[in-house]
A protein has these predicted regions:
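Conserved H-loop
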Residues: 84, 218-219
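Eukaryote-biased recognition of electropositive, low-complexity segments
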Residues: 221-223
Length: 224
């Protein structure tokens, strides 16, 4: 079975573990923060809250499980960061560690250094929301270039608005934004089903093979 992406180039017959995370929001006071905190430009220091320390522990635990799975399956690791990896400075929020981009860049290096240490075979960066990552996903594009993420060969960009992968004949479809929602108690359980049907029907109307799995983020709600 072939492992391929982009236009179907053969990569490997090795098993693959695909790890997808999103909305990490590096720089938010409600996002993960390393236990040593981060030094501020003025000489002070920001230390993580109890919630942030818990998030950091959960983050490390997740990647430890991924490492164990890769080892058990003798699998290659592919990582997808599905948008809003940075918090930015938006909507007059006070819930940021610092408005200094360098502070958020340091936090991103520490936070995403955890999966980087696992030496993934491929890393894909998906662009998120303008309010968080700037016009045209500028912050995530710069970050993707800095870590030499997988490049979109068609556009030459280091990050992606829409990523389609084919891994061992299994099709994946990745975007940050979703086209449906369901916030009411009686509509929330059906949001994923509505989105699945929309994705399937849009592909069929264009005579395309629908993905086996589609990932959408942004809503901060788990639904399957």
């Amino acid at each position: 079975l072939d492992v391929s992406h982009g236009h179907g180039g053969v990569l490997s017959k090795r098993p693959v573990v695909l790890a997808v995370v999103s909305d990490v929001h590096c720089g938010s006071t409600l996002a993960s923060c390393p236990p040593e905190g981060v030094r501020l430009d003025e000489g002070g220091k920001y230390l993580p809250s109890i919630v942030q320390r818990w998030l950091w522990a959960a983050w490390e635990d997740y990647w430890a499980q991924i490492r164990a799975l890769c080892k058990a399956e003798h699998a290659a690791l592919w990582v997808v960061l599905n948008g809003d990896s940075f918090e930015g400075q938006h909507h007059g929020t006070t819930q940021i560690v610092s408005a200094n981009p360098e502070v958020q860049a340091y936090l991103a290096a520490r936070i995403f250094g955890v999966p980087k240490a696992l030496k993934p075979a491929h890393t894909f960066i998906i662009r998120g929301t303008e309010a968080h990552v700037g016009p045209s996903g500028a912050t995530e594009e710069a970050f993707a270039r800095s870590i030499r993420a997988e490049r979109d060969k068609d556009s030459g960009r280091w990050s992606w608005w829409h990523l389609r992968l084919a891994i061992h004949n299994v099709r994946f479809d990745m975007q940050h934004h979703t086209s449906t929602s369901g916030n009411l108690p009686w509509t929330r359980p059906q949001a994923a089903q509505r989105l699945a049907f929309r994705i399937w029907s849009e592909h069929k109307l264009r005579d395309l093979d629908a993905p086996h799995y589609a990932f959408r983020s942004h809503r901060h709600i788990y639904s399957d």
